[in-house]
Amino acid sequence: MGMSSLKLLKYVLFFFNFLFWVCGCCILGFGIHLLVQNTYGILFRNLPFLTLGNVLVIVGSIIMVVAFLGCMGSIKENKCLLMSFFVLLLLILLAEVTLAILLFVYEKKINTLVAEGLNDSIQHYHSDNSTRMAWDFIQSQLQCCGVNGSSDWISGPPSSCPSGADVQGCYKKGQAWFHSNFLYIGIVTICVCVIQVLGMSFALTLNCQIDKTSQALGL
């Protein structure tokens, strides 16, 4: 691999990381917007930090940091930054695999906790504005009512509940949505993992090539 190949690899790695950095900025900005507007509220009162805004801010920040290291490491041909980029990608990949395994192993327990969390939050619909906004959004988007049905609303279903006797509860409707989109979720997850592995491979290759070039130039 000559100098021309080194430059090509360097700019390819920089370009893709720059795109990811821009995506991270957009995700972070949207997350901050949701936090400021408090649009979707809190659905699980026992996990108040688990809101769409918080999740997007965390994900966007991580993407920006990792992509920044990749950009600077590639364009500056800095081995320390490249290895930091590689290690962070590896840790993220391991975390994703660990999370997938835990979700599979504890699927029933997680389902139980989700149902309990939903049943608890529905009791605070009229007393907590964030909880009310979250439930109104979920019910209007999924066209569902309550956790298991409209009977969950003791004082009567709110206006966000769709009318009709055969309306499903949001718990089953959410499960149905997840299962119907499982293939697409799996494809996106695999694509993300492949991109991460490619990024790690490019970083290692560029790092090794920098060593070879330095040795050839007697540096």
From Swiss-Prot:
The keyword Transmembrane applies. The chain crosses the membrane at residues 12-32, 55-69, 81-106, 182-206. It is found in: Cell membrane; Cell junction; Membrane. It comes from the Eukaryota. Gene3D superfamilies: Tetraspanin. One of its GO terms (molecular function) is protein-membrane adaptor activity. Residues 2-11, 70-80, 207-219 are cytoplasmic. It holds the Pfam family Tetraspanin. Glycans are attached at N119, N129, N148. CDD domains: CD53_like_LEL. Spleen and thymus, B-cells, monocytes, macrophages, neutrophils, single (CD4 or CD8) positive thymocytes, peripheral T-cells. Interacts with SCIMP. Interacts with CD45/PTPRC. Interacts with IL7R. Interacts with RBL2 and PPP2CA. Required for efficient formation of myofibers in regenerating muscle at the level of cell fusion. May be involved in growth regulation in hematopoietic cells. Belongs to the tetraspanin (TM4SF) family. This is Leukocyte surface antigen CD53.
